């Protein structure tokens, strides 16, 4: 019979095993406008997170985040801190979809901080985040915009790879977003799915059986932008809702699979951006 002391020792050994195998990574950099051209400023990378800058483009600088760990597992910690200076333009994506793997221990932690100065623009356009069954992750996204800054941001989450016959039944997904413009909080949201996620997604008021969800934020945004984004809405293959308030526009997406979600998000993002999306989105 296992004693309390032996249980504590087993728990401590398990914790040490998780700690030894946890990945960590951070990326911190800024971009600034120099003679009308956006250039990289200071850059700090550590652990398994890297950023690469493809050839410069006329409409600003492009960046690609790379997780050399190949995915995110329980207890991993990653942080991203990006600052866009006055009149600078940056579009950022990821090299591939981020995979959050099964965890029998602590949740992974993802912390993202984005700052944009006056007349600066940030396109935060990562590819999908895919959660495997029993994945556990907590994400924080904090955004600070100056009064004349602009933002195009999207995030999409896939609960299980349905095309591979996989479903996500249990796990933990906590997603905290905060957006401030000129120091004023204009958007705050925390999504908490914990436990039987598959059953929660089946609820009509949650996802009505959808397993692929996404959010796009556009700032500044108004009713005129909303009407433009709603054009050809009858062609959407997923459930899509678009609205505006507090000087920002938002689009919500919910689909039965990742392919439909991506197609609808790309249609909205192209119209919102007024330009082509990152090439990696097309591969």
UniProtKB/Swiss-Prot annotation:
<comment type="subunit">
    <text>UreD, UreF and UreG form a complex that acts as a GTP-hydrolysis-dependent molecular chaperone, activating the urease apoprotein by helping to assemble the nickel containing metallocenter of UreC. The UreE protein probably delivers the nickel.</text>
</comment>
<dbReference type="Pfam" id="PF01774">
    <property type="entry name" value="UreD"/>
</dbReference>
<protein>
    <recommendedName>
        <fullName>Urease accessory protein UreD</fullName>
    </recommendedName>
</protein>
<keyword id="KW-0996">Nickel insertion</keyword>
<keyword id="KW-0143">Chaperone</keyword>
<keyword id="KW-0963">Cytoplasm</keyword>
<dbReference type="GO" id="GO:0016151">
    <property type="term" value="F:nickel cation binding"/>
</dbReference>
<dbReference type="InterPro" id="IPR002669">
    <property type="entry name" value="UreD"/>
</dbReference>
<dbReference type="GO" id="GO:0005737">
    <property type="term" value="C:cytoplasm"/>
</dbReference>
<comment type="function">
    <text>Required for maturation of urease via the functional incorporation of the urease nickel metallocenter.</text>
</comment>
<comment type="similarity">
    <text>Belongs to the UreD family.</text>
</comment>
């Amino acid at each position: 019979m296992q004693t309390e002391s032996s249980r504590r020792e087993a728990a401590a050994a398990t914790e040490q095993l998780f700690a030894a195998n946890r990945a960590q990574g951070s990326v911190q950099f800024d971009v600034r406008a120099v003679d009308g051209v956006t250039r990289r400023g200071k850059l700090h990378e550590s652990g398994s997170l890297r950023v690469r800058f493809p050839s410069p483009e006329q409409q600003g600088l492009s960046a690609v985040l790379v997780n050399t760990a190949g995915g995110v597992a329980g207890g991993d910690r990653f942080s991203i801190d990006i600052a866009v200076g006055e009149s600078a333009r940056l579009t950022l994506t990821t090299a591939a979809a981020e995979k959050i793997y099964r965890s029998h221990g602590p949740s992974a932690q993802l912390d993202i901080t984005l700052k944009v100065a006056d007349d600066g623009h940030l396109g935060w356009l990562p590819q999908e985040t895919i959660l495997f069954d029993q994945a556990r992750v907590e994400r924080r996204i904090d955004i600070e915009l100056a009064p004349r800054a602009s933002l195009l941001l999207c995030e999409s989450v896939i609960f299980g790879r349905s095309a591979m016959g996989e479903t996500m039944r249990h796990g933990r997904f906590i997603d905290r977003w905060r957006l401030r413009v000129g120091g004023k909080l204009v958007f705050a949201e925390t999504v908490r799915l914990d436990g039987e996620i598959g059953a929660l997604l089946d609820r009509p008021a949650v996802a009505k059986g959808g397993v692929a969800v996404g959010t796009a934020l556009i700032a500044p945004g108004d009713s005129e932008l909303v009407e433009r984004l709603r054009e050809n809405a009858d062609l959407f293959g997923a459930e899509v809702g678009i609205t505006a308030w507090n000087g920002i526009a938002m689009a919500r997406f919910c689909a039965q699979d990742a392919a439909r979600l991506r197609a609808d998000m790309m249609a909205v993002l192209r119209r919102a951006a007024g330009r082509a999306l990152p090439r990696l989105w097309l591969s």
